[in-house]
Amino acid sequence: MIGLVGKKVGMTRIFTEDGVSIPVTVIEIEANRVTQVKSLENDGYRAVQVTTGAKKANRVTKPEAGHFAKAGVEAGRGLWEFRLPEGQEFTAGQEISVEIFADVKKVDVTGTSKGKGFAGTVKRWNFRTQDATHGNSLSHRVPGSIGQNQTPGKVFKGKKMAGHLGDERVTVQSLDVVRVDAERNLLLVKGAVPGATGGNLIVKPAVKA
């Protein structure tokens, strides 16, 4: 089963019949329109390309306009691709709704995490701070030593140091599906998902379910 592209609306909570509060993230999944179907013969692999949402006509390039017109769909805010498992078939112009998750218990959600800019090691890697006093007047939040000695005489690749934090692709796995609202194109999942409100999300059935 393929996934769908949605948009993060925000977080809220719902109550069960027993009065238990469940924190949920609301994901709006408008109909995903199939723009292209890739095949083994033509492309070397099986996949389906989809778009969703809308894009202003004056923001659509001519190549994009031709691509959407060929599929007979309205121009969307982007293009996403999902590998097609054996036995599943789609056609260009077809619409896929949030209802495909009606019988799914858990999902994996992929998004772009919030960018935090340049961050130090305490914030980025949870390094502990050094002494506040006892002779330490300058080095409270510095990382400390980053190497050894003349041997190896270098800083190893992957060393945890200060640098850019966030704004990267993150996947949260096996989130419980709490509710599927087909009328309003909403999917409610338990817990938090990556990214800011309004960010694009890719929702797939959980691989570890």
Swiss-Prot record:
GO biological process: translation
Keywords, alphabetical: Methylation, Ribonucleoprotein, Ribosomal protein, RNA-binding, rRNA-binding
Sequence segments annotated as region (Disordered): 133-152
PTM-bearing positions, type N5-methylglutamine: 150
Top-level lineage group: Bacteria
Single GO cellular component term: cytosolic large ribosomal subunit
Homology family: Belongs to the universal ribosomal protein uL3 family.
Function, in words: One of the primary rRNA binding proteins, it binds directly near the 3'-end of the 23S rRNA, where it nucleates assembly of the 50S subunit.
Complexes and interactors: Part of the 50S ribosomal subunit. Forms a cluster with proteins L14 and L19.
Protein name per Swiss-Prot or TrEMBL: Large ribosomal subunit protein uL3
Organism: Yersinia enterocolitica serotype O:8 / biotype 1B (strain NCTC 13174 / 8081)
Gene responsible for this protein: rplC
